[in-house]
Amino acid sequence: MLKEFREFALKGNVVDMAVGIIIGGAFGALVNSLVNDLLMPPLGLLLKGVDFSNLFVVLKEGTPPGPYIALADAKTAGAVTLNYGLFVNALIGFLIMAFAVFLLVRSINRLRSLSEKSAAPAVAPQTKECPFCFSIIPLKAVRCPNCTSQL
């Protein structure tokens, strides 16, 4: 049983999948940092200092009643909130990630199509044109079936 597991684990697909998951996790962290640290602060500045992570709606107030300035204050008070600012951050992160994956898949498909075109052997023509009546005839024909000319 241990031998079978070792063969399964060392197959190329399993190892490739593990590497993909690890790189995907690191790429996800990179995209999250890009969104939270580089894109959202300038966007918040353009929108007059709005911090998207603190955009929320109080559904039910906590023990000290609101208004709550920050999401952390509302959470500390035990308020039930709808955190749409965090959703906006996650949505922007998802769109960036989806676009990056789209570009990656598009590049891989182009490379595949280029390698398939170069690997495909040149197909020899199977037909030719009769020089007398200009109809298409088999390449090995010695007489045209249309005009009966000797080729």
UniProtKB/Swiss-Prot annotation:
A Gene Ontology molecular function term of the record: mechanosensitive monoatomic ion channel activity
A GO cellular component annotation in the UniProt record: plasma membrane
UniProt-listed Gene3D superfamilies: Large-conductance mechanosensitive channel, MscL, domain 1
Compartments where found: Cell inner membrane
TM ranges: 14-34, 85-105
Pfam families: MscL (PF01741)
Keywords: Cell inner membrane, Cell membrane, Ion channel, Ion transport, Membrane, Transmembrane, Transmembrane helix, Transport
Membrane topology: Multi-pass membrane protein
Binding partners and assembly: Homopentamer.
Family: Belongs to the MscL family.
Function recorded in the entry: Channel that opens in response to stretch forces in the membrane lipid bilayer. May participate in the regulation of osmotic pressure changes within the cell.
PANTHER family assigned to the protein according to its UniProt record, in alphabetical order: LARGE-CONDUCTANCE MECHANOSENSITIVE CHANNEL, MECHANOSENSITIVE CHANNEL MSCL
Matching HAMAP family: MscL
Name this protein carries in UniProt: Large-conductance mechanosensitive channel
Gene that this polypeptide is encoded by: mscL
